[in-house]
């Protein structure tokens, strides 16, 4: 079975070699059929600490790296702009 890939936004980089990535999923409401945005947060391994808050990244599913970390950052798609 292929590994899953997701694209999301880095919302926290406070940990060492770990970032929290928020992934948005748009699904229709079961009763009202309106498109609803659901957000899930995943902890992802960032070996070189390259990711910053606001970066758009691609993450790849991996075997468990810790109690809550099951994803690895593949690459940074868009870097956050610093004002």
Curated annotation (Swiss-Prot):
A GO CC term attached to the entry: cytosolic small ribosomal subunit
One Pfam assignment: Ribosomal_S17
Gene Ontology terms: biological process: translation
Key words of the record: Ribonucleoprotein, Ribosomal protein, RNA-binding, rRNA-binding
GO molecular function: rRNA binding; structural constituent of ribosome
SUPFAM superfamilies from the UniProt entry: Nucleic acid-binding proteins (SSF50249)
InterPro entries (alphabetical): NA-bd_OB-fold (IPR012340), Ribosomal_uS17 (IPR000266), Ribosomal_uS17_bact/chlr (IPR019984)
Family listed: Belongs to the universal ribosomal protein uS17 family.
Alphabetized HAMAP family for the sequence: Ribosomal_uS17_B
Subunit-level organization: Part of the 30S ribosomal subunit.
PANTHER family, sorted: 40S RIBOSOMAL PROTEIN S11 FAMILY MEMBER, SMALL RIBOSOMAL SUBUNIT PROTEIN US17M
Entry function: One of the primary rRNA binding proteins, it binds specifically to the 5'-end of 16S ribosomal RNA.
Name of the featured protein: Small ribosomal subunit protein uS17
Species, as recorded: Gloeobacter violaceus (strain ATCC 29082 / PCC 7421)
Taxonomic path: Bacteria, Bacillati, Cyanobacteriota, Cyanophyceae, Gloeobacterales
Gene expressing this chain: rpsQ
